[in-house]
Amino acid sequence: MSSLRPDEARKLATAASVSPLSNCQFCGVVISSIADEQKLEFTNKYKGSCTLLCSYDSQGVVLRVVSDDDRSHVLKEYMIAADTDAAQMGRRSYAVSLDADNLVLRFGSEQDQQLFRKVVENVKHLRPKSVFSQRTEESSASQYFQFYGYLSQQQNMMQDYVRTSTYQRAILGNAVDFQDKIVLDVGAGSGILSFFAVQAGAAKVYAIEASNMAQYAQQLVESNNVQHKISVIPGKIEEIELPEKVDVIISEPMGYMLYNERMLETYLHARKWLKPQGKMYPTHGDLHIAPFSDESLYSEQYNKANFWYQSAFHGVDLTTLHKEGMKEYFRQPIVDTFDIRICMAKSVRHVCDFLNDKEDDLHLISIPLEFHILQTGICHGLAFWFDVEFSGSSQNVWLSTSPTAPLTHWYQVRCLLPMPIFIKQGQTLTGRVLLEANRRQSYDVTIDLHIEGTLISSSNTLDLKNPYFRYTGAPVQAPPGTSTQSPSEQYWTQVDTQGSRNSSSMLNGGLSVNGIGDGMDITHGLMHPH
C-alpha cells in the first residue's frame, strides 16, 4: 500500500531516517536465488514475477513477497535492517542478502530499481535513535502500537460521543483557522480528525500514524475520495519528514490523568513543523487534583490484599507475601467515576501549555498542593481529572473529564493512600504530587500529604502504567450521609403530588390507573430521588 503520490514520496526520500517512501510496492519483479556464487549461477526462486510490498517498521522496512497473480497470499516476508547487505547489479537488478537467502531482484524498470535502492539506503543510513526511541522501551512501544492498530480500539474512542463531537465542534466552529490551511494530524489513528479538518476547508492534511491503523486510515481516505486532501504517512512524528510547514496541528494526545502514555510529548515535538503563530488543537490542558473520602473503595482494595493474609490456603501459609500484596494493590491507580461530593476541598489546577511548554518539562512534573478542607472526614487519597481547551479564532471549546461532566472513555482516576488521614473542616492539607516519566510510556506518581500545623502526614507511590479499571456501568451512588431529608418520605410526597396533578387532568378526560393517574412514571422517584 502506497499512501503517497510518487512526487511526494521523492520529497520525503531525503529523510535521514526510514521515511514514508518505505511504504510502497514494486510489481513485475523476477526473484532469483544465487545457486553458485563462484560461477554466478542463478535459479528462479518463484514461478513467474512477483510484487514486493514494502512497509515501515520500527526496526527498518518489512519486505513482503506476493505473487503478481494472487496478492492475497504472502510467499515470504523479510526484514530490511541497517545491517542488510545489498548492492546494485546493472541498471535494473539489485542483489540483497535477507535472512539465509542471497537474492537477485530484477525490476520491471530502472526507476523501480532506483526507488528500491533508496528504500534500502534509507534503512542503512538510519539516524541515531529518535527522541521517541530514546525515551521508550522497545517492548512498550511494540505493545502500544499493536494496541492502537486494532479497529476495536479505534471504535472505542470514536464511539465516545463527548470526545468525538467536541473535537468536531471545535474544528468546524473555528473554520477560519482551517480554511485553505495546511494541517498536521499527530497520531491520526482512523483519521477522523483529519476528516473534520477537511470538512472545515483544509487545503491539505498530513495524517501521521505509526501503528498498522495507517492502512485502514488510507482505505477510509480513498473510499471517501479525499486522497487529494489527506495524505496518510505511516511512521512516528519524531522520525518522519514533511515536505512543508503546517498552519495547524490537531491531535488527541491525552491519556488517563492527562499525561499517561506520554503522547503529549509527541504532540509538543510536532511543533517543529508548526509555522510561527500557528494553532494547536487542543491548546492547553488542565489537570485537576482534589482530596477525597471513600471508605468503600479503600476497603475494597484493602480486602483484596488480605487474600495474602491466609495462613492455611489449601494447606499453604501465604502470609509472607501479605506486605507485598498490600503494596501492589495500593500502587494501582483506580480508573472509574464518582460523585464529586466525595471531594473534600476545591481542586488544585495544574496547567500544561501545549503552545509553549517543552518536551523536557513533561519528564518530571512537580505539582504543589494546598487544600482548604470543606468537610470533616477521612482522606483516602487524591482524585484526578482533566479539561482541555481548544482556543480558536472564532470560539473557545472545552472538553472536560470532570465528574460533573458527561462521562468519557477517560473516566476519572483516584490514587489511594495506604494510611488514610483524618482531617477536619477548616484545616489546610498541603503537599506535592510528583509525576516522574518512565520508559514504559507512563509515569510513577508520588503523593505526599501533610496536615498543616500537625505531625500527621501520609504518602504513596503508584504505577500509572498498571491501573485498576473499576468502572462497571452502574449509576454513580451519592456519598453516604448526603441525604438531609427522609428519602422515603420524599418519594411518597412526590407520588402524592403527582397523583394530585393527575386527578386534575382526569377532569379533562384523563384516565386513572389504580387510583394514581394516567401517564405517571412512579419509577422516576425511585431512580432519581431528590
Swiss-Prot record:
One of its GO terms (molecular function) is protein-arginine omega-N monomethyltransferase activity. S-adenosyl-L-methionine binds at Q154, R163, G187, E209, E238, T266. It is found in: Cytoplasm; Nucleus. The modification Asymmetric dimethylarginine is found at R501. Keywords: Chromatin regulator, Cytoplasm, Methylation, Methyltransferase, Nucleus, S-adenosyl-L-methionine, Transcription, Transcription regulation, Transferase. SUPFAM superfamilies: S-adenosyl-L-methionine-dependent methyltransferases. One of its GO terms (biological process) is positive regulation of ecdysone receptor signaling pathway. Transmembrane segments: none annotated. Its EC number is 2.1.1.319. This is Histone-arginine methyltransferase CARMER. It comes from Drosophila simulans.
